[in-house]
Amino acid sequence: MTLKSQDYAALAEDAYEDRAGGRRDPSQEPAIDIGGHMYKVLEHVNDRRTGYQGTVYLREDTNEVIVAHRGTEQILHDALIADAGMVVARTNTQAPEAIALTRRAVEWAEQKSELTGKHMEVSVTGHSLGGALAQVTAHHFDLKGETFNAYGAASLGYRIPEGGNAMVNHVMAADPVSAASGHYGQVRIYANPNEISNLHSSGFRNGAVAQFLVPDSALLAAGRSLQSHKMENFLAEKSVLDKPETQALAKENSGMISEYRDKLEFLRGGVTTITRGGMGNAADIIDRIRGPLDAGEPARKVTEEEQRRSSSLRMDDAQHPGYMMFLGAQRGVQEQDARVGRSPDIGSTQLAGSLAAEMKAAGGERIDSVLMNK
């Protein structure tokens, strides 16, 4: 991947832009400047029912495909339904749409790679809720990417492991959202003086003895640190990404930062346990016993299930992936029956099915006509 962290940040921010939904033909789509690089939008989804919004970009100079999932913007759909659902139910109502959009991006890149003979990289990004969706989809399809102040996906009910190097998750030290849950991938922490001051005034100290002697309040600190969650911390002249001193400050104050973030995650875990109830907690215990899934395994399982389902269907079943090809073969066989004065029967249907199966096995996409050998 040639994209830098600042490039991902620009795309995560651009995902908040309102666009007409649907797929685009890149040959007909104008290029747009995002963070100093030219991109074309391949697809945009904006579902007002669930609040999900995502955009697929094609970077012109490198032919890389990036899926950017939009973060928390609408209070009702995002904060109350999607964000709260991650805490209470360990699920995300927007995840199925995010996975579907990412799947289309991966399939598009694979098709283009076959045509050109050059591999096209696909990666993901997002801020806040969008960062959680980026982690979910990265694990689902075994992709790389970067997030910004994401709600960590490791606590969700998708059997996603915590840690690893598949993702880079950039977080502000006092951001309460990214502190509430473990992350898929590595975490890079940045701090500014105002955050350290807020943590200090909320009772947090560096060093075990100081932490023991001075009472602290994670919720008070979180309430004072809402500015830390904003995407602007990673953009333009305010960006902490290219300021080594922000990571150095975080390292110098790692004691109080870790204490604060650990307490917020503990509090979130308590809320999850209480609201999940007996059945929910039992399911969570089973998931912990089963352990996390390998990266890419969810997508492989879906593919295997689709193949199993399609192999059990007859070619003349409308759900079969070769059904349209069967209809073309059937139409051609019936035309030949009519030419010789024969009424179509079960044999005609079987012949059409055989022709369609052979054409599909040979890599064909459709049957336009059927001709008899002389």
What are these regions (language model features)?
Residues 8-9, 122-123, 173:
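Mature extracellular "passenger" or substrate-interacting domains of secreted, surface-exposed proteins
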Residues 20-122, 140-141, 151, 155, ...:
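A conserved cap/lid and substrate-binding interface adjacent to the catalytic center
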Residues 58-64, 139-331, 336, 340-352, ...:
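Serine hydrolase/lipase
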Residues 12, 68, 171:
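Residues in well-ordered beta-strands of folded domains
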Residues 67, 127, 145:
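Divalent metal-coordination and catalytic microenvironments
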Residues 125-130, 134:
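Gly/Ala-rich beta-loop-alpha elbow adjacent to hydrolase catalytic centers
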Residues 8-12, 332, 355:
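Short, Φ-rich (hydrophobic/aromatic) sequence segments
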Residues 1-24:
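N-terminal low-complexity, Ser/Thr- and acidic-residue-enriched intrinsically disordered segments
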